Amino acid sequence: MGNELRHRTVLLDEAVESLVTRPDGVYVDGTFGRGGHSRAVLARLASAGRLIAFDKDPRAIETAQGIEDARFSIVHDSFASMRDALAARGVEKVSGVLLDLGVSSPQVDDPARGFSFRADGPLDMRMDPTRGESAAEWLARASVQELTEVIRDYGEERFAFQIAKALVARRAESDRLGPLDTTGELAQIVGHVVKTREKGKDPATRTFQAIRIHVNQELADLQVVLDAALSLLEQGGRLVVISFHSLEDRIVKRFMQAHASAPAVDRRLPIRAVDLPSPPLKIISRQFPSEAEVAANPRARSAVMRIAERVTP
């Protein structure tokens, strides 16, 4: 219960107000978490409205199953499965899709989940601990090159190569020291390599982010769900995405811009602008948490919300 109480949904009112344009529509919450956005959406829906939520985390599913509302259903899967999951439920078009990306406070705050370097725990990092390869299992087999690429590309860590070498060197000592399987030891290894310090940021922050993104295929799944959302949105439907770091936000920004712009055509070709297909999206706005929200919930500081609307059938 403590974790449930500590979780604060970021940009709650702003997201739901931007999302729900038709109270009798069908909406998707791609990241149920602990249900903050879902409950607020349900409060705005009419009796004919419908909300379908997704989450990989078994604990989120347990929370969702406690919502007794005929308009609500939960899917225990990644939002990357959205297109097929909705088709299986007879849903062809939706009035809005909400994505609240990243890891939730209850996941970070529970040492047993292995997301945080602040308290020692098993090196897991999976959103769904029942599926796929854990962080410890991946670290036990990844090459220096693969480690470097993941830590560099997903963590934007300039010491990626040095960290990768240190991790492989530690693996060579597994017969004597045992496997690298705790968050505390991983943070310690990274801390010994990263000599410079960013103000207010633990030296392991970027590496933990990178490994978590890789283990959960977060950026690949994000691209899949953005494409799915575009195809599922009815005319006038909204796509609302809240991201918490530059890698996510860059993907969302480029996706929305690409689909809100007319196709590029060589000016030498005899094609009139009026003959080109209209872009499917219109960018509505970009919003940030208020100073008051950041003061009450420091984890909201890095959040950015982007909103786009489908303008073509």
UniProtKB/Swiss-Prot annotation:
Record's keyword terms, sorted: Cytoplasm, Methyltransferase, rRNA processing, S-adenosyl-L-methionine, Transferase
Catalytic activity from the UniProt record: cytidine(1402) in 16S rRNA + S-adenosyl-L-methionine = N(4)-methylcytidine(1402) in 16S rRNA + S-adenosyl-L-homocysteine + H(+)
GO molecular function: rRNA (cytosine-N4-)-methyltransferase activity
Enzyme kind, highest EC tier: transferase
Family indicated by similarity: Belongs to the methyltransferase superfamily. RsmH family.
PANTHER family (UniProt xref): 12S RRNA N4-METHYLCYTIDINE METHYLTRANSFERASE, S-ADENOSYL-METHYLTRANSFERASE MRAW
Name of this protein: Ribosomal RNA small subunit methyltransferase H
